[in-house]
Amino acid sequence: MRGPELGPETSMEGDVLDTLEALGYKGPLLEEQALSKAAEGGLSSPEFSELCIWLGSQIKSLCNLEESITSAGRDDLESFQLEISGFLKEMACPYSVLVSGDIKERLTKKDDCLKLLLFLSTELQALQILQKKKHKNSQLDKNSEICQEVQAVCDALGVPKSDTSDIPLLLSQVESKVKDILCRVQKNHVGKPLLKVDLSSEQAEKLERINDALSCEYECRRRMLMKRLDVTVQSFGWSDRAKAKTDNIARIYQPKRYALSPKTTVTLAHLLAAREDLSKIIRTSSGISREKTACAINKVLMGRVPDRGGRPNEIEPPPPEMPPWQKRQEGGGRGGWGGGGGGRGGGGGGRGGWGGGGGWGGGGGSGGGWGGSGGGGGGRGGFQGRGDYGGRGDYGGRGGYGGRGGYGGRGYGDPYGGGGGGGGGYRRY
């Protein structure tokens, strides 16, 4: 522990006097001259010795120390010095001149005696502060927050003021007053509570933690909104016309602004006091709500917005991306796989297999299965003319892909043969 910083001798005497007065010392050394004279005399001064004993006893009552300062007298100065030395060592005194060196030479100077008094008095003052903080939550006085809240409840209910600070007694008076008031009102005047179960201590602690987390979150949001309010009002003063009225704006705005607190006031008591009607959710845009929230400034800031449309039942359908479907027309076109390719190709369809007006191109056969005069291929035969895969022209008759040459002359034999342009089909020689 660091000792107090020492200045001139007069300043040290003033610090000792101020500390002793704050500690409630009522002895003869509250005068500067008497204190200076006793410090010059040292341990031989009875007033100085009595003050050291008083400070030591007060310190020992607040903390557990083995050493103590009890004896004093001119005949037993050495034992008194030993007690003071042991007491200072146990207190971890930072002044080396008071705890080291020859014990008979330690408290012979006025400055050293003032250091001893200043150390003991400041240590006692620190111990008293710590002791007060320790028992602050257990001992309630009239100025505590709970007493103030209970007293505010008593004032609101008209309970006579009492000098007692007994919280249970005040609460019993409040309870009897509330019951008396409820007997004189309608039955459903207060309503049923929203929370119908009794909370245990564990549930109450959990709700307190939840409320603390929510309060921290909403405090952040409230600070953001308040900052936005400050910036908005500040922007109003940028114009030359408003700069002349800065004082008027501040006089009107600042009292209302300082009344806004970033910390929320919602506690667990609000949950216990909530009624069933609080669970009914009313839309903020409903007619009943807007009767009290609507004002002329909404129309001034926004004005009347024109109708922008956008209703689905009024939107016209988009134009078609594909042409309308049409029924397939009957009759051959230019053939199946080919069209008017080659020589005499093209023409309408006959009774051929793969196509009417020529498969790969040809001059439209009149009949035949895979061949005939108009089948798949061209010329005067489909895939076969008079033979298997060809007649006088496979991929072409007199045009198309070839002349008269196909895969062969009269083919490979009899099957599927045709006469080239006649009755085609499954014809034999």
From Swiss-Prot:
Keywords: Cytoplasm, Nucleus. This is Protein FAM98B. The keyword Ribonucleoprotein does not apply. It is found in: Nucleus; Cytoplasm. The lineage of its organism: Eukaryota, Metazoa, Chordata, Craniata, Vertebrata. It comes from the Eukaryota. Residues 304-429 are annotated as: Disordered. The keyword Cytoplasm applies. GO terms for molecular function: identical protein binding; protein methyltransferase activity. Residues 332-429 have a biased composition (Gly residues). InterPro entries: FAM98. Residues 305-314 have a biased composition (Basic and acidic residues). Its main location: nucleus. Belongs to the FAM98 family. Positively stimulates PRMT1-induced protein arginine dimethylated arginine methylation. GO terms for cellular component: cytoplasm; nucleoplasm; nucleus; tRNA-splicing ligase complex. Homodimer. Component of a tRNA-splicing ligase complex. Interacts with FAM98A. One of its GO terms (biological process) is positive regulation of cell population proliferation.
